[in-house]
Amino acid sequence: MWERIFLAAALALMITLILGPLMIPVLRVMKFGQTIREEGPKRHLAKAGTPTMGGIIFLVGIVVSALIMAEKPTSLEMVMVISAMLGYGLIGFIDDFIKVVLHRSLGLRAYQKLIGQIALALLLTWGANRYLGRGTDLVIPFTSIHLELGLFYYPFVSFIIVGITNAVNLTDGLDGLAAGTTLFSMLSYVSIATLAASQGGGVAILAYESDLAVFAAAAVGGCFGFLRFNKNPARVFMGDTGSLALGGALVGLAVLTKTELILLIIGGVYVVEAISVILQVFSYQTTGKRIFRMSPLHHHFELGGWNEWKVVMVFWLASLLCGVLGVIAYMAGMF
């Protein structure tokens, strides 16, 4: 199993590194350039026109690698997690296309995006229960306690799914930030899926569970390869195509490994980023005052004098620590 995991990461890395130099000029010629918010940090204005929608680059690497290295590429686990990633990626692609190609700055309207995200979340949770027997219970982090929610499971977990996918999207605001934080989150899921496959982890495990570890490893390789082109100064941005797809991959892994609540620990950086936006909007609308210099939180530190690379490194470290804590929370429930 470990051989397939390492090879999946290596193959996704190689494919991404090969595709990058081929795709970036194409995106540039097609004028798929990023528009920069004028109210954002002034140093970001120099990034205007940088090719976006680059998430396509690592998505190809992840999918091809995962399918080649999977024990059974057509297993329901693999089909569902890839579908979750590509489904949310498709919403992001449509959003990017409207903004960049059709020049409608806001892209998909909020309600349109939300309808698609909720529909995918309900399909994922229903499918995992109906076809893979994952159940409608939640495992409480750091324990082996299962909390049965019944039908309430679907709206509750769908709320988590939509929240996390959008939070990953919010985190994609600095060069290398979303790719790096997701890399560490995916490393956590390599560990969790491997533990689930080898020991059961206290949940109902079906055949080919190790393929989820292979998929997560491919995502690690894809994110690592993309950093070659996305680190500061970025030659390409992943766009909503990439960030929503990565969020979809994470929630797919969470639902299929029964770590829906542990995902909130592993994705702690995303959660904090999303909360910073919610608090900022609430404070401004109720008091007329802002809590942060700018939200999401990474911009607050930027406007406080931190250079972009320092912010990214601190957030990467936070993501690593959250990932380790998430794995510990999972392992604690095994004993």
From Swiss-Prot:
- What is the protein's membrane topology class? Multi-pass membrane protein
Q: What is the designated name of this protein?
A: Phospho-N-acetylmuramoyl-pentapeptide-transferase
Task: Identify its protein family.
Answer: Belongs to the glycosyltransferase 4 family. MraY subfamily.
A Gene Ontology BP annotation from the UniProt entry: cell wall organization
- Molecular-function annotations in GO: metal ion binding; phospho-N-acetylmuramoyl-pentapeptide-transferase activity; UDP-N-acetylmuramoyl-L-alanyl-D-glutamyl-meso-2,6-diaminopimelyl-D-alanyl-D-alanine:undecaprenyl-phosphate transferase activity
Q: List where in the cell it is found.
A: Cell membrane
Q: What class of enzyme is it?
A: transferase
Q: Which reaction does it catalyse?
A: UDP-N-acetyl-alpha-D-muramoyl-L-alanyl-gamma-D-glutamyl-meso-2,6-diaminopimeloyl-D-alanyl-D-alanine + di-trans,octa-cis-undecaprenyl phosphate = di-trans,octa-cis-undecaprenyl diphospho-N-acetyl-alpha-D-muramoyl-L-alanyl-D-glutamyl-meso-2,6-diaminopimeloyl-D-alanyl-D-alanine + UMP
Instruction: Briefly state the protein's biological role.
Output: Catalyzes the initial step of the lipid cycle reactions in the biosynthesis of the cell wall peptidoglycan: transfers peptidoglycan precursor phospho-MurNAc-pentapeptide from UDP-MurNAc-pentapeptide onto the lipid carrier undecaprenyl phosphate, yielding undecaprenyl-pyrophosphoryl-MurNAc-pentapeptide, known as lipid I.
Q: Name one GO cellular component term.
A: plasma membrane
> EC annotation?
2.7.8.13
| Required cofactor(s) | Mg(2+)
**Stored InterPro entries:** Glycosyl_transferase_4, PNAcMuramoyl-5peptid_Trfase, PNAcMuramoyl-5peptid_Trfase_CS
Name its pathway. Cell wall biogenesis; peptidoglycan biosynthesis
The residues that cross the membrane are 5-25, 50-70, 78-98, 114-133, 145-165, 177-197, 200-220, 236-256, 262-282, 311-331
